[in-house]
Amino acid sequence: MSIKGVFLALLGAAGVQVLLGIPFLLSHPVEYISRAFNLGRVFIHFWSVNFKFVPEKYFVSKELAIGLLIFHLTTLMVFAHFKWFKHEGGLFHFVYSRFRDATSIQQLISCKPRQSILSKEHIVTVMFVGNFIGIVCARSLHYQFYSWYFYSLPFLLWRTQFPTVVRIILFVVVELCWNVYPSTSYSSLLLLFAHLFILFGLWSSPAEYPYANKKEKADRESKESGKAM
C-alpha cells in the first residue's frame, strides 16, 4: 500500500470512530471528547492485576507512567528493527528506502508499493506481538482486559522456541494469575514474570521470512530442483 493508501485507510478508521460517537458528539461533545480520549487517566490501584506489587504512591506517579511509555516505545522499535523488518535491512533502512528515490512530496505520496505479499503468519505475528508488548507495559490491567490478549496467547507461545511443556506451564500460570481475585502482590509479580518470559521467548526466536510470494516461489524452485536430481 502506498503512503496515500495508508492515509486514506487511517481516515476510514477515524470515520468509523466519528460515526459511532455521533449520538454523544451531538448531545455532549465536550464531555465525550474529554473523557473518551483522556490519556492521563489513572486506574484504581486496588483493581489492577498488573504491577499490583508496586506501592500505590509510586503506581499512580507520572514517573512510572513515563518510564513504562519509554520502555513500551523502545521495545516496539527494537522488535521492528531487528525482527519485523530484518529482511528489509532494519526499520531505518526500510524507511530510508521509501524516501530515497522520491524527488518530491507528490512523488513520495503517489509512489506505488512493491509487489510483495506479506505472509499471513507474519501479519498475525506482528499484530499479536505488538499488542502483547503493550500488555506487558500497561501500568494497570483490570480483569476485563484479559480479553485483549487471551486469544493470542497460544499463538504467541507457539512462536517461541520453548519446549511444549514450558509453553503449557506459562499458559497455565498466566491463567491462574488472572483468576486470583482480588489480585495480590505475589500474583501480580508472577504475572509480570510470565509476561517477560514469554516476551524473551518471542525475542530469542528466529525472525521469520515475511513475504509469501517469494517464499512460495523459493519452495517451488527447491521442489523442482529436488525432482530433477
Located regions from the model:
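Multi-pass membrane glycosyltransferase architecture that uses lipid-linked
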Residues: 1-37, 41, 62-229
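Juxtamembrane membrane-water interface segments that cap and precede transmembrane helices
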Residues: 42-60
